[in-house]
Amino acid sequence: MSTSRPSQSSSNSRRSRHSARMAQATVDAKIHATFEESGSSFDYSSSVRVSGTADGVNQPRSDKVTTAYLRGKMIQPFGCLLAIDEKNHMQTCKVIAYSENEPEMLTMVSHAVPSVGDHPALGIGTDIKTLFTAPSVSGLQKALGCADVSLLNPILVHCKTSGKPFYAIVHRVTGSLIVDFEPVKPYEVPMTAAGALQSYKLAAKAITRLQSLPSGNMERLCDTMVQEVFELTGYDRVMAYKFHEDDHGEVIREITKPCLEPYLGLHYPATDIPQASRFLFRKNKVRMIVDCHAKHVRVLQDEKLQFDLILCGSTLRAPHSCHAQYMANMDSIASLVLAVVVNDNEEDGDTDAVQPQKTERLWGLVVCHNTTPRFVPFPLRYAREFLPQVFADHVHKEIELEYQIIEKNILHHPGHLLCMLMRDAPLGIASESPNIMDLVKCDGAALIYRNKVWRLGVTPSEPQIREIALWLSEYHMDSTSFSTDSLFDAGFPSALSLGDVVCGMASVRVTAKDMVFWFRSHTAAEIRWGGAKHEAGEKDDSRRMHPRSSFKAFLEVVKARSLPWKEYEMDAIHSLQIILRNAFKEDTESLDLNAKAINTRLRDLKIEGINDLKIERMQELEAVTSEIVRLDYTATVPILAVDVDGLVNGWNIKIAELTGLPIGEATGKHLLTLVEDSSTDRVKKMLNLALLGEEEKNVQFEIKTLGSKMDSGPISLVVNRCASRDLRDNVVGVCFVAHDITAQKNVMDKFIRIEGDYKAIVQNRNPLIPPIFGTDEFGWCCEWNPAMMKLTGWKREEVMDKMLLGEIFGTQMAACRLKNQEAFVNLGVVLNKAMTGSETEKVPFGFFARNGKYVECLLSVSKKLDVEGLVTGVFCFLQLASPELQQALHIQRLSEQTASKRLNALSYMKRQIRNPLCGIVFSRKMLEGTDLGTEQKQLLRTSAQCQQQLSKILDDSDLDTIIDGYLDLEMAEFTLHEVLVTSLSQVMEKSNGKSIRIVNDVAGHIMMETLYGDSLRLQQVLADFLLISINFTPNGGQVVVAGSLTKEQLGKSVHLVKLELSITHGGSGVPEVLLNQMFGNNGLESEEGISLLIRAKLLKLMNGDVRYLREAGKSAFILSAELAAAHNLKA
């Protein structure tokens, strides 16, 4: 699959991958049909090579080929199958299809000489209720009555004639219900309970171990998963597969019994696991093949049916013949495959959305192989299905962590770029370190600048690079950037002459003739198989389907392809492109030692200005801190704080009321002396973590009551804690914001103490009773109190005796829909931990109520015991935030959404402005090449200065950097004349519209003085203050610009220039509100106020200031800045 696209959004990329997979599915079908026709003459390697070019010529001959590939009518012989007519299945359970071995397995008795009537006839139209005992029929009908019939799998049934036990596994397909029957082996203890709660217990140890692993180590996670599955299943080999972006697979982890050939590191083509199989893995996450040599059993269906039965969801579905042969060739007779399905998109979306569904993708597989036939009972397989779900959740978290690391690395790109360009720009990007090869992962890079070529690392020759540049200019002139993982697939004529050295390339065009290239070698060069090596003289048969052939075929496919270019890598490349466009405009002469002295002096002055600014900000922070302290003191929730030694230094009115301890007495006491003994260890651990900077939420502890409150007992608090830090980011204390749950805890404690009379409490409509629901030991809902009814909108009679996992809380057709599959798995883990007797902590929980509103709360689960101490179910308690807190959170979400929308709108506008701006720059450059007069050239220079100022403003994405004084100024030579003329040009349209006369009173020698500093920022400041002055000048008035310049000698030949400009205007002047905003004295800034504040901060960065003077009938802005006299630098 070629990826030679100039640029592509992530959504387009996803659509492209989807289209490629759809095309690959039809190719898979053709390969399968070819295999069936070829038999023993099938050539595996050539089929894989052909599949690599999935074009119109290689499409299957008809849709029937694809249909035959997807619709098989064979099952494995270890079980049997029935299909029931879905229309009246609750009354008649009429058979419309059955497997040929069904009569033998279900109706034959065990004695040698059968009697008449021993077994009922089985055929089309048979009522299956005649085949099983009454309790079995009752269980089947109960399952068939569920909206999701698979929730109760497996269902234990007994044959009426033989009494043999079977597991019935039910699923729904179009027009029918498919029931797979798997025999219960003599050595098994039959599982009489249905659903996930019982199956979980079989994998509890492995799940607990997975959940205990620390984050940030994908290799350890995969190792643990493979080890646990190996121990749990007993198979000879367990491998973890990972699917890459191009859908090829890799064995990333493996564990085997001795004497088996290892496959670790094996890469295999995408065709080895067809797209149709991958789709089925997403639907049915466990797949078992008991014996690949076993003869398959046909399924017979009613000839009157208008449709073909689809057996894709059957646990008994027979493997395709090509897969069975592949298994046999690698000496694998039995297999068990567990699918690892993760969320495809990265963002959860709005929690209030009505349908916040995530798309899923198949991340990989955990594959078990055995050298002899092996059967795993369904309950054990179901438990193994739960295990990869937990594993998939952890994989998803690791993927998100990897994305965060990538984003963090992206933040380092500007630093790399600046380091490259600070020395000998622009040639420093190729001749210094770091250079362009350090920007992204590559094998080589090249720069074409002024018709010369600089090469780094492994690259094509200089003539070949020039040929590539010419090809890009001819065929990709419309794009300024280009990337591909295969120059051959992209259409480069001389790609074959490059050999294996260069396959992939990314490039950017800086100017019409200057370009930067990055090169990558073929993927196969970076791939090593850790499997067994050949013995002397041993050779592979490439026609034979085998892992060695798969690896060889994969190398054949990727030998002319490199690793794909990631989006974040192209972002870094584009960033360099933007910076180089400015750097390539002209080569600036290097400055002498005097320039370095000026830079040093200016940096010192800048630091002094920053320190002054910090003092000013500290004063502002002190005022803000005082206000926060006042708010905390009067808050309606308990708030307390301690210093690094654990001594209380914050104790608000609410906590004083609850504990009976006045503020003066609490201050200075150690927090551990104020909490209950039972909470000491928990609070001590919490303090230690907080002092290390680790924040924690929803921590519960009890605090003592004193004085008048002593007899009321301890106060139960749930706190969110955060570390308090000083200006140097050192932790100086801990702040606790608490929620009083004493009333709820007293109710819960009373409930636990008086369990025999729990109904009087649970069903009480007192508002202090929290929402409570419960299940029995089999997962059926057995409790749903009034508070739960009010919260969810579902009545008690609507949920009782339904499966809690799936029917009540689930992701599809459940009453209370969960946000995603991860939430469903986490709920199952919490319930099952309590069911197995393990201690559980409060966990965040959320679901959509009947009215579509998303409910967020904390879930606490307690086991329910009978008189003998056996677990008979669980009780679940929900803790909701107070209405005030919910309102605050709602307002916060609305504010975040509004800010996000504004940020998106701003990003869109900035992005849309850049393209027209590039067009304006291009038009100006074209005009510069024409025959222009002096006045016209001056207008072009003014236009260029305005364009550069606009580009600079568009790059200002973080205003806090400017406000806090951390913006880097770009120093260059300029004259005040250039700056003033450009600034005046930006306000002339406005002044002409108001008939305002602008007078330039700056002396000529000052105007022509050559200065050294950031001219664009000075121009930006001056233009804004001119605009504000004109806005508040009456029509027909006058604005006068005057200036003065003084020099202070630094050393023998360097002069520091103190520039002062005044902008005087008539009228009543600028309102005080705006001036207060300019000086940062008002937090509610208008657009004009923000503009003035930013310009004042820019002057601060230039060691300057702004003042505003009022006189009778006129007012003036006085602007000052410190620069350097540039003409003295060359002396």
UniProtKB/Swiss-Prot annotation:
- Gene3D superfamilies given for it? 3.30.450.270, 3.30.450.40, Histidine kinase-like ATPase, C-terminal domain, PAS domain
Q: Which GO terms describe its biological process?
A: detection of visible light; red, far-red light phototransduction; regulation of DNA-templated transcription
Q: Name one GO molecular function term.
A: protein homodimerization activity
Its post-translational modification remark reads: Contains one covalently linked phytochromobilin chromophore.
Provide the disulphide bond pattern. none
Keyword Transcription regulation carried by entry: yes
Kindly list the positions annotated as binding phytochromobilin: C322
Residues forming the PAS domain are 624-694, 757-831
Q: Which InterPro entries match?
A: GAF, GAF-like_dom_sf, HATPase_C_sf, His_kinase_dom, HisK_dim/P_dom, PAS, PAS-like_dom_sf, PAS_2
Give the compositionally biased regions (Low complexity): 1-13
Where do the record's region annotations for Disordered lie?
A: 1-27
Give residue ranges for domain GAF.
217-399
Record keywords? Chromophore, Photoreceptor protein, Phytochrome signaling pathway, Receptor, Repeat, Sensory transduction, Transcription, Transcription regulation
Domain Histidine kinase intervals: 908-1127
Taken from the UniProt entry, a GO cellular component term is: nucleus
- Tell me where on the tree of life, at the top rank, the source sits: Eukaryota
What SUPFAM superfamilies does the database record attribute to this sequence?
ATPase domain of HSP90 chaperone/DNA topoisomerase II/histidine kinase, GAF domain-like, PYP-like sensor domain (PAS domain)
The UniProt family comment states: Belongs to the phytochrome family.
Self-association state and partner proteins as the record states:
Homodimer.
Query: Function, please?
Result: Regulatory photoreceptor which exists in two forms that are reversibly interconvertible by light: the Pr form that absorbs maximally in the red region of the spectrum and the Pfr form that absorbs maximally in the far-red region. Photoconversion of Pr to Pfr induces an array of morphogenic responses, whereas reconversion of Pfr to Pr cancels the induction of those responses. Pfr controls the expression of a number of nuclear genes including those encoding the small subunit of ribulose-bisphosphate carboxylase, chlorophyll A/B binding protein, protochlorophyllide reductase, rRNA, etc.
Tell me the PANTHER family matching this sequence: OS08G0260000 PROTEIN (PTHR47876), PHYTOCHROME 1 (PTHR47876:SF3)
The protein here is known as Phytochrome A
Task: Identify the species of origin.
Answer: Glycine max
